[in-house]
């Protein structure tokens, strides 16, 4: 019998109809007719937040397996959360590859140990790791602990072991890290902010009062002008950049870009102007001069809301590149003259007519008068007509009904003048009246997903949570310390909110030391380590080089790739007695002792460092909160267990710390009280829950808290606090981080809220997550209205006065002072004003000044040849000698990110490694033609510190600029390669970069240095 294929299936189906096979769905006709099931139907959905950049995109993670025995959950799909106000379901190429990151073959599963001189890892147990690390730390602490300094002052510090803290770990991990390190007396505590956005805090806080992004991602849509300078938002923050495009498409906004390269952001801009790397201050000072000369500023705003009218001391001055008070030997200023003339009551003298020759307004005019369009062109290489066109665009937003939003990132921060780059733009925004406005602001686009939060929590050498300062050895007792850090108003009647410093500090000490902190022992003041100088990462690696450091803990950080002068970093790590890495991934730092040929040429047998490689969980494997660039604290949930026996950072820190406590309790040693009195009273001490830690960070009442005016109880004993306004300085409140007060209230976890309603249409989704401070979305929003309370632009009205209080579409960033009261909108400042003149808050001057990069292609400073580079920037002797000169290294090198990669992480993720598999550098067409370099050639890029090899991408995107009579060519160097990961092996870009940083924060000068390039 002959049958067709179709007939055959019919016969088979009929014969199977009553069989078990048919019951299981194997009958072809049944299978063919069945509707295909939705592949996510049987999965578990978990909400999380992207671990990469600071946009803070919402995620939906899907896993199979219900967590029962033999059914371990495994995440197999991740997509954007469509309900999230910022990303609305979208993800960038990095976020699209998150599953490959979670399941990377580079994920660590077991603790491992590398013995001194060994060339291999050996697997050990957690008990062995914790016991050995605790033993090494205690031995080092007991041998090198400094209880008193040479003057006999109690300092209780430990300098010979340090800790490098993470950039993407949760706030709860960060808070535990702060307690862990300070309980041991550590001062060498630093995080990713030191090498990225440290200058943001150092510039925005002196200018406005707080060192954070002033607005938020969605608010960018309200701008009439978006200026991207010192960053490449389309590449580095693509989903956040959609809001700039939203402004263009739906608000008619113009987008302008000023950058050494024609970037992906420039590709969609309305106008692009080139600039020589490292000359932003000259360019922006020229903009200031243009605004002043053409009266393109908001006069009423400037007079009422800035310190333009305040009178500066007669002995302040500036001449030939230096402000008054400079000490060339110390490379520091005596800043005593950088302040106001005071009246008999201690308030600043003022001339509201702006006629006094010593008022800030006239000193500013005098200072920027040198930055004419011709001077800008000569220094920056920007054609004069292009510069003036940018000025015109910016000047238009001085109108009351227009705003400009300025977006910047590491292109501004990673210079030896990084903080002053940002301050110059902040001054422009004050003149334009764009601060506090919807669609305005100075918007720092943070690089890492929680670098904002970890900075908020004070994981820096001289910091404490909430931007408080760790005591110095000059502050010998609590009262001296509080007096030094509690400012007095400089104008009558101002809020001066830092005047509440004692409440913030005492409440933090109660969170740290609990019942052990009492008024009698000054709330445990002497248990905090006291610093003599900053122990930032550049300082600390210099100490390593000198043999003064024995131990180092790297938590979620890869300094071999991330720090300047890779060869110096390798040499420093080789001098340690022990190194502990805590990371989900295998990193170059954990393997610094391995020989990888010219990528890392070392002799393992000569490196005597004991190395511990401890596997930690990643973002998808723990609960917790992180803070995006817009200050939103967003809670995320665990979607799966970590591979192998990896632990959370909190469990790892607890494992080490609890062993140290046990040893100090049983054996004694150097200042056991400092270690034993730190609270660690979690329900499961070796496994603190994120929820417990978040509640501790928020704070609670330790006794009934009463209203000072009425005596009524406003918070009952044991209850969570709802606001930092409830904090007290008498020990009756506990709060680990005062700016996070309100994040976990009696009503529950505010960070987990998911109401994305936006009734104003301005993007202020007050019911989504929680923003510090007190859920305010736009900082300084009282400045959105004039002194009488009328909005500058009714379409952007944020606040209104209802007769008794301020209300509106945002939480008022202000007191209850009524319109016309004269209380300024910058409530953290002593004057209540934004500062055009920064007083003594900046290292190199109260006004910004153009200084050349330490490796300048010009060899001089056209403004003042005797003061070429930042005179207040610190540089060590050997690093100064390692600086290159333009005769041997004639081109400007600058490093940057690609949209397909995230720093040194995504080379471990297969999808991203496929998208950008091979290391390359960008060379302008004219230079390539001159050097005989063609597309795809292998080239060697060298500085005075080392070299890398990469493929050449010859491009029109980088042009030759003319500055001070010289042709200036730039070499673009993406940073993402190394000798670990699934991507093709490559050189570490920071082999090339100089070991010098911003004068205020020591953030390295990655964006402008000298190189040579040659065809291999």
UniProtKB/Swiss-Prot annotation:
InterPro entries: Asp_de-COase-like_dom_sf, Formate-DH-alph_fdnG, MoPterin_dinucl-bd_dom, Mopterin_OxRdtase, Mopterin_OxRdtase_4Fe-4S_dom, Mopterin_OxRdtase_prok_CS, MopterinOxRdtase_cofactor_BS, TAT_signal. It is an enzyme of class 1 (oxidoreductase). It catalyses: formate + NAD(+) = CO2 + NADH. Residues 43-106 form the 4Fe-4S Mo/W bis-MGD-type domain. It holds the Pfam family Molybdop_Fe4S4. GO terms for molecular function: 4 iron, 4 sulfur cluster binding; electron transfer activity; formate dehydrogenase (cytochrome-c-553) activity; formate dehydrogenase (NAD+) activity; formate dehydrogenase (quinone) activity; metal ion binding; molybdopterin cofactor binding. Residues 1-33 form the signal peptide. The keyword Oxidoreductase applies. One of its GO terms (biological process) is formate oxidation. Keywords: 4Fe-4S, Iron, Iron-sulfur, Metal-binding, Molybdenum, NAD, Oxidoreductase, Periplasm, Selenocysteine, Signal. Its EC number is 1.17.1.9. [4Fe-4S] cluster binds at residues 50, 53, 57, 92. One of its GO terms (cellular component) is plasma membrane. Exported by the Tat system. The position of the signal peptide cleavage has not been experimentally proven. Binds 1 molybdenum-bis(molybdopterin guanine dinucleotide) (Mo-bis-MGD) cofactor per subunit. Binds 1 [4Fe-4S] cluster. SMART domains: Molybdop_Fe4S4. Its cofactor is Mo-bis(molybdopterin guanine dinucleotide); [4Fe-4S] cluster. Belongs to the prokaryotic molybdopterin-containing oxidoreductase family. NCBIfam families: formate-DH-alph. Allows to use formate as major electron donor during aerobic respiration. Subunit alpha possibly forms the active site. Formate dehydrogenase is a membrane-bound complex, formed by subunits alpha, beta and gamma. This is Formate dehydrogenase-O major subunit. It comes from Escherichia coli (strain K12). The lineage of its organism: Bacteria, Pseudomonadati, Pseudomonadota, Gammaproteobacteria, Enterobacterales. The gene is fdoG.
